[in-house]
Amino acid sequence: MSRRDDRSDTLICSFCGKSQEEVKKLIAGPTVYICDECIELCNDIIAEESKLEDATATDVRKLPKPQEIKEVLDEYVIGQSRAKKVLAVAVYNHYKRVEAAVKPGDVEMQKSNILLLGPTGSGKTLLAQTLARILKVPFAMADATNLTEAGYVGEDVENIILTLLQASDYDVEKAQKGIIYIDEIDKIARKSDSPSITRDVSGEGVQQALLKIIEGTVASVPPKGGRKHPQQEFLKVDTTNILFICGGAFPGLDSIIQQRIGVKTLGFGADVKKKVEKKAGELLAGVTPEDLLKFGFIPEFVGRLPMLASLSELDEEAMVQILKEPKNALIKQYQKLFDMEHVKLKFTDGSLVAIAREALKRKTGARGLRSILENAMLDIMYEIPSQSMVKEVVINEEVIYSKEKPIIVYENVAESA
């Protein structure tokens, strides 16, 4: 590179071409010159690269430990202690593997994808969402019942990756370390445990389509979703380090486990059957890969989900705890809304039990709690903003069972509404 302008004795920067009159400082080397502006730019580039290297080196140390992960899960999800431990360990090991620099000859560590088994409303989705929040990674959720294998009417499995990309603002690097939760995974089991000779586009076919992205592949994702066509441009996403959590209720799986362990359910065993049904959650806790094969999953798919965690059905006591104890408990949310109106909201113990019992009748687990509360609270939430001098609102069991109006306490006078 020239160190002088050929037309004069003016010195110029060998990198940007600016003359010594255009810059503050020009530093000479053996055959080149560099200006202060280029030096500053080089410093910025080096500093940025150092930050990235430091971040990679310290991410493993910043990763929450399994006990810390479970403690945060306890703040949002009631019960399910063993499932939380399985999730905490699996997630910790997964991200430890992701952040560790793999050297030639190192032991190859496989992904710790997770299968959650448990009844509707037992907390499967909430656990997955909370994990993503703890780890500050993008989270996407998909419904397995909408998926079909490529070429059939329905949603391509690659669109799951698109949802994760959208959650990470199309930052491919961030998306490649995200979490995907696939709900209703039991719905893609084939209809029998023998291989099908006909096309099963929403069962075994979907399992085959999911295999590669769950294990790890470079997926071609249409930026706007929908079906692929040859003229389209695709985003390339490596799914190797994406953690997949699959969940489902698995109705009938407990019967398969009963048959395997030899529980008597006929004749004189009628009483035994009643006891076993009460402990369906305990049966699911003993699930094996062979049980999942009989349920209708192909061996390769079961092999991609090595971590199994079962969730038990919620009882009345757990439902009451869910209403009032978690950080985002429904009762706390409603009380906050009333606080904004400068009104105290109180729920009696009887009202909480009534809400829990109504939810248990609906057999929708914790999901039913919100709709019961919304229905009970609608009228009072409509009226309170327009009323003055209201000091307190009390919700008792009659509001839930008999649709009676809540008790309203005014600033100076207490009376029933």
From Swiss-Prot:
GO cellular component: HslUV protease complex
Top-level division of the source organism's lineage: Bacteria
CDD domains noted in UniProt: RecA-like_ClpX
Positions that bind ATP: P119, T120, G121, S122, G123, K124, T125, L126
PROSITE patterns listed in its UniProt record: CLPX_ZB
Keyword Nucleotide-binding: yes
GO BP, sorted A to Z: cell division; proteolysis involved in protein catabolic process
Annotated positions binding Zn(2+): C13, C16, C35, C38
PANTHER family attached to this UniProt entry: ATP-DEPENDENT CLP PROTEASE ATP-BINDING SUBUNIT CLPX-LIKE, MITOCHONDRIAL (PTHR48102:SF7), ATP-DEPENDENT CLP PROTEASE ATP-BINDING SUBUNIT CLPX-LIKE, MITOCHONDRIAL-RELATED (PTHR48102)
Subunit structure: Component of the ClpX-ClpP complex. Forms a hexameric ring that, in the presence of ATP, binds to fourteen ClpP subunits assembled into a disk-like structure with a central cavity, resembling the structure of eukaryotic proteasomes.
Purpose of the protein: ATP-dependent specificity component of the Clp protease. It directs the protease to specific substrates. Can perform chaperone functions in the absence of ClpP.
The protein's name: ATP-dependent Clp protease ATP-binding subunit ClpX
